[in-house]
Amino acid sequence: MKLTELLYPFAFLPVCLLLYYVLPKRCRNAALLAASLLFFAWGTPEYLVLLVLAILLNYFAGLELESLLEDGKTGHARLVLVLTILADLLPLLFFKYYGEAAAALNRVFVLSLPVHALPAPVGVSFYTFTLLSALSDVYHGRAPMEKNLIRFALFVSFFPKLTSGPIVQYADMQPQLEPHEFVRERVGSGMRLFVIGLAKKVILAGLLGTPFYALKVLGPQALSVCGAWLGALLYALMLYFDFSGYSDMAIGAAKMFGFEFLANFDYPYCADSVAAFWRRWHMSLGFWFRTYIYIPLGGSRCGTARTICNLLLVWLLTGIWHGAAATFVVWGLYYGLLLILEKFVLRDALARVPAILRRVLTFLLVVIGWVPFFSDTLGQAGAWLARMFSAGQAGFVDAAALYYLRTTWPVLLIAVFAALPYGCRFGNRFFRAGRTASMVSSLYFIGLLLLCIAGMVNGTYVSFLYAQF
């Protein structure tokens, strides 16, 4: 089920919310779990068995881990941990990477391996990382293993976060798995955040996506320098509003049910360094890699050479997590190298650069970094980057670039304003306390919702970009 289908915000979510608070407390988690499994199975019911088996495997493995650790059998516990992690990773590796790997082996070794093109289960990358988080937190004593199977299954499959995160850590959500009471202010706050996220996705990302895909269809060879930069800028803003919009919808929906999730974005395009950008962008994924990969490898505590290796490995894995294509590998290594340069080579020089210039430089580096991310092949990425820095047949600026600049500048201005914290501050001042302000705020959110409905009915938006990961 897609979160931008009319069925989700106007039927599925309201019915689930109503049932959750109408049912007795002892039935609420079971009802929410049933709704989450239905959400997962919608459209691809054949994959439900994979999720159920993963939940059962990790539930019993977690109980066994805790029991072995209490008995002091650390070696046996480590064996259970490793075997369960391998079992968790198998579906992810098969559905996301087998096709690319088989095709590569066929090319290199002239083999005839079958290249399957099976669609991946909904949110397989996200719920796999959720399961690994639970195992690690139990093994390292960060949280006790949840003894109630329904509550544990709900942690894994809770539908607001299932499709594209945020990746909620087990230690953060486990204390919240008790049924929640209805709190009007909390539900209202969640609804407002949900509408804001829906508007980001349907309105802003949709309006930015139309010219971007038009420029991408033209191809880098047909673009001018201005057109290539405009396309990269449109994608940078579109991806931000697409993914942060989904995150707001997920966090808002979870809040309606009483769950408090941490923010997943913190105005990343205001960052004054690449490291700061990644502390603000997809924060739940960054926290996951830092907590479960980077720090266990030694982090930055083991000398310069080891730290460089750790950074490169983590960013290689981050790229591969997004996909097996070479473009994602290059994208991950690009950020690994930038972070190494910032940390070990350019730190003192950058400290002397004014903050505003550091922000501009960081933003330009990030925009450049999105080119391999949205490109279908390395050749396309290289051609697009070449066009950004050297004029081809279309020159510095051409009719296509001027047309899309002329038709998109209003939405670009709105998008830039909304991507900066000033937009939030303006909203907070505008909707300050008071009856009149409350009425204006209500009308504002109703208007946003109506615009979203219009966009959803007309289909003037693209599917969630991060749903493919």
In which residue ranges do the predicted regions lie?
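Membrane-embedded transmembrane alpha-helical bundles that form the catalytic cores
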Residues: 1-468
